[in-house]
Amino acid sequence: MQQGQMAYDRAITVFSPDGRLFQVEYAREAVKKGSTALGIKFKDGVALISEKKVRSRLVEKTSLEKIQLIDDRVAAVTSGLVADARVLIDFARISDQQEKVTYGSLMNIENLVKRVADQMQQYTQYGGVRPYGVSIIFAGLDSIGPRLFDCDPAGTINEYKCVSIGAGKDQVTAYLEKEYKENLSEDEAIRMGIAALKSAVADESSMKEPEIASIKMGETFHVFTSEEVSKYLN
C-alpha cells in the first residue's frame, strides 16, 4: 500500500487528494470476489441468472439461494458479502411492506431501488460504519414494463437492458455487448444468459445447476425448479 494512500483509507469520510474514497473502492473489490450473476430483459419480461457455488459437499444446496424475491413482482440477485446482502434484502422487503401498510399498495420498483441505494449511500459518509460490500441487481415489472437496475456499494443506480455483477462481470458484459438483441424470447434470453455465464466462470461445477428466475407481463416471478433449469444446460 502506498504511504499516501494509507493516510486516507482509515476513515470512510475522508477523501484522498485525487477525490477517492478508498473504503468504497475496497467494498467494490469485495463484490469482484463474489459469485457471477446477471439480469437480462426479453420481449415481455426480465430474467435473473446466477452461478451457484457449493464450497463443500456437506452443504445443503437448498440453503444457498442467490436469487431472492422481494415480493411477487420484484426479485433481486446479489454478489459480494452474503451477510451484507441478507441485511439489504430484508431492508428492501420491509420497506416494500411498509409502503403497502401505509398507502395500500406495494412500492414502485424504481422507488424501491432508490430506497435501498439511499441506505447504501449513507454508509459511505458517516464515521463508525463501513460500506456494504455487495452489489445488487433488481428486476421486475411496473406500468412502464420490464425494469432492470444495478446498485453498487456507493449507492449508485443504473438501469440496463442486461447487466452483470460479480467476479466474471467483465467477461459477461463483453459477451452480452456482442450478442444481445432486443425483443428476445424468454427462452432465447435465458440461453444467452447461461452462455454468457459459462464464458466467464472458471469453476464449471458452479454452472451445473445455476439459479434462474423470470417474470413476464401479467404474471408473477417464477423461480425455476431443478428440472426446468436442466433443459437449458443440454
Swiss-Prot record:
Gene Ontology molecular function: threonine-type endopeptidase activity
Subcellular location: Cytoplasm
Top-level taxon in the UniProt lineage: Archaea
InterPro entries for the chain: Ntn_hydrolases_N, Proteasome_alpha, Proteasome_alpha-type, Proteasome_asu_arc, Proteasome_asu_N, Proteasome_sua/b
Pfam family, one: Proteasome
Regulation: The formation of the proteasomal ATPase PAN-20S proteasome complex, via the docking of the C-termini of PAN into the intersubunit pockets in the alpha-rings, triggers opening of the gate for substrate entry. Interconversion between the open-gate and close-gate conformations leads to a dynamic regulation of the 20S proteasome proteolysis activity.
SMART domains named in the record: Proteasome_A_N
Role description: Component of the proteasome core, a large protease complex with broad specificity involved in protein degradation.
Family: Belongs to the peptidase T1A family.
PANTHER family in UniProt: PROTEASOME SUBUNIT ALPHA/BETA (PTHR11599)
Protein name (Swiss-Prot/TrEMBL): Proteasome subunit alpha
Species name: Picrophilus torridus (strain ATCC 700027 / DSM 9790 / JCM 10055 / NBRC 100828 / KAW 2/3)
Lineage: Archaea, Methanobacteriati, Thermoplasmatota, Thermoplasmata, Thermoplasmatales
Gene transcribed to yield this protein: psmA
